[in-house]
Structure formats: C-alpha cells, structure tokens
Regions:
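N-terminal topogenic module of multi-pass integral membrane proteins
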Residues: 1-43
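Membrane-interfacial loop-to-transmembrane alpha-helix junctions, especially the N-terminal start
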Residues: 1-6, 51-62, 135-139
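Hydrophobic alpha-helical transmembrane segments of multi-pass membrane proteins
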Residues: 25-35, 100-111, 162-172
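Internal transmembrane alpha-helix with an interfacial aromatic "cap," most often the third helix
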Residues: 33-66, 71-79, 112-126, 184
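C-terminal halves and exits of single transmembrane alpha-helices
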Residues: 65-113
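Extracellular/periplasmic helix-loop-helix junctions in multi-pass membrane proteins
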Residues: 86-90, 151-172
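Alpha-helical membrane segments in multi-pass integral membrane proteins
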Residues: 107-115, 132-153, 168-175
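Membrane-helix boundary/juxtamembrane motif in polytopic membrane proteins
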Residues: 117-148, 187-206
Length: 217
C-alpha cells in the first residue's frame, strides 16, 4: 500500500553523517535524503487512489528529489577533498550550495508533510480509526513548528540553544512520524491481510504490539 516505504524513507531522513570539515560545519550524509525522497515517491504511488492529498505530496517529491541529488553530489565532491587538496580549497563554496538547497527545501518539506498528514487523516477517518486521525493533527503541529523554526534559523542569527532545541525537535518529529506510519501499517494495511503463522520473535513482538494497540482502540 505504501506505508512501509514511507516508514523506510523516514529512517533515511534521520541525521546519520560524518564530518568532513567540522570548522565550517561541512559533513557527508551517510544515509542521503535523496534515497528517502525516492522511497517517498514510490510509497505515495500506492496511496494515490485513496486521497488527492497523497497525489499532491507525491508531486512535491519531484523538486525534493532534485534538491537531494544536488546535495548528495555536492557532499560527494566535498568528500573527495579529503584526498584531493585542489577540491578542499572549494569546501566553503560547496557548503554554500548545500545550505542554499537546504533552505529552499524547507518550505517544500513543510507542504509535503502537511499533504501527507491530510491524506492519512482522510484515509484513517474513512476506515474509522480516530486515534490515527488525532495523531495526524499532532504531526502537523510538530512539523509546522520545526520547519518554521528552520526557516527562522536560516534568516535570523539566533542563540546556540535554539539550534540545539531544533536538533532535538528533529528527532521528536521524525520518530513521531515513524510511530504514526507504523500505526497506519498495523491498523490499515496489516489488518486487511490474512493471519500468518509466526516464525520468529520479531513477528511475535509485532503481533503483541498490534493486539495491545487494538485493545487501546
């Protein structure tokens, strides 16, 4: 249906990087956002029939894919500078390119999350899952605060503790989306499948979590 691919995409959006030049804040993303956007594009393909909002969210993955490609290319060239001194001379230019693309991506991501949540809310309401409907409202608020904060940081010099709060909020937002997408998979997708024999402890744990969530509903 697509929720599994969206879940995988959000794990790629988490910050897993290595430093190239810490003095200017240049790094390389080990799990590139480009892969996350590809997973979003593919995952939303399966969700298109259920809401126009999923269609709009999928449209937004196209410019995000372009942005992710530029960022990955710039980071890859910068990484070569660790071994090629001639490239290292242009690290600040590459960092400017990366920061510019990141700033442009912020409003795109804000609208992407809004359309994604609206689509999930519409689908959850249709299958009568009020808890997931409520989770989409929380997700919209969290992502709005986070991305508006990112825009503010890009325009106005702010104290260091604000940056630290945004880093913390990054993990809160993405883990909340992972939790919400897991709920969608278990209650919307997995609930429609035929029961299968449990072959391993992981599947057994998922079954128990599903039963607990069902009891809470």
């Amino acid at each position: 249906m697509g929720f599994g691919l969206l879940f995988a995409g959000y794990t790629m959006l988490l910050v897993w990087g290595m430093a190239i030049d810490p003095s200017i804040g240049l790094g390389f993303d080990i799990l590139p956002d480009l892969v996350a956007y590809l997973l979003f594009w593919k995952g939303l393909h399966g969700l298109r029939p259920y809401s126009k909002n999923f269609v709009y969210a999928r449209y937004l993955t196209i410019p995000l894919l372009a942005a992710g490609g530029i960022t990955f290319a710039a980071q890859s060239v910068a990484l070569l500078g660790k071994f090629v001194p001639a490239i290292a001379k242009h690290w600040e230019l590459l960092l400017t390119v990366i920061n510019t693309v990141d700033t442009i991506s912020v409003p795109l991501l804000l609208f992407f999350h809004a359309y994604l949540c609206l689509g999930i809310r519409e689908l959850a309401a249709e299958v009568e899952l009020p808890k997931i409907v409520s989770r989409t409202k929380v997700a919209i608020v969290l992502s709005s605060v986070y991305y508006f904060g990112q825009l503010l940081v890009g325009m106005v010099p702010l104290p260091g503790f604000i940056h630290m709060m945004l880093v913390l909020l990054t993990f809160i937002v993405y883990f909340y989306y992972l939790y919400m997408l897991y709920s969608c998979y278990m209650h919307i997708v997995y609930a429609d499948e035929e029961p299968k024999e449990v072959f391993n402890p992981l599947m057994s744990l998922l079954e128990k979590m599903k039963k607990k969530d069902s009891d809470d509903e």
